A protein has these predicted regions:
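N-terminal presequence-like segments and the immediate start of the first folded domain
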Residues: 3-81, 85-98, 104-152
Length: 152
């Protein structure tokens, strides 16, 4: 390999590395302390450019790892309130949600979840999918994770 070709290859690799590092610099890890207790091994949300990825929320009392009592409806309501609180802590609203994924310990509780979920939106709903899942965190009946479009 000629020296000129070798130098060109090194410069290209250095440029690619610098570009990748700059792209990584746009990742922002968000933790407000308003919903999740400190010390968990994940961020409550991560912003990459104009997209905010929210970690899954279960129906915990904010600041604790204790599920609210009352079953699927109360857990669903609290999970959605936790999503709203997380969004608001980072300057966003429920209307900024683009997609939600719902995991239910018992897919037969879909209707009960949906009755609560629909009260959190006016007119338009995010794209959504749902599935049954065994072994949700903390023994929860429902977990909801969402993706939001950030406003500038």
């Amino acid at each position: 390999m000629k020296i000129r070709e070798w130098i060109l290859a090194v410069c290209c690799l250095a440029g690619a590395h610098a570009t990748a590092a700059a792209e990584r610099a746009n990742v922002e890890f968000l933790d407000s302390g308003k919903v999740l207790p400190a010390g968990l091994p994940f961020s409550e949300a991560v912003r990459v450019g104009d997209v905010v990825y929210l970690s899954g929320q279960v129906g915990i009392v904010p600041g604790t790892l204790k599920l609210v009592p009352g079953g699927i409806r109360e857990e669903s309501r609290q999970a959605m309130e936790n999503i709203r609180a997380t969004l608001e802590a980072h300057g966003l609203a429920m209307s900024d949600l683009a997609r939600c994924t719902v995991m239910l310990a018992d897919i037969g509780e879909w209707t009960a979840f949906n009755d609560v979920y629909t009260t959190f939106f006016v007119g338009r709903y995010p794209a959504r999918s749902a599935f049954g899942a065994k072994g949700l965190a903390l023994g929860a009946r429902v977990e909801v994770e969402c993706i939001a479009a950030a406003r500038d």
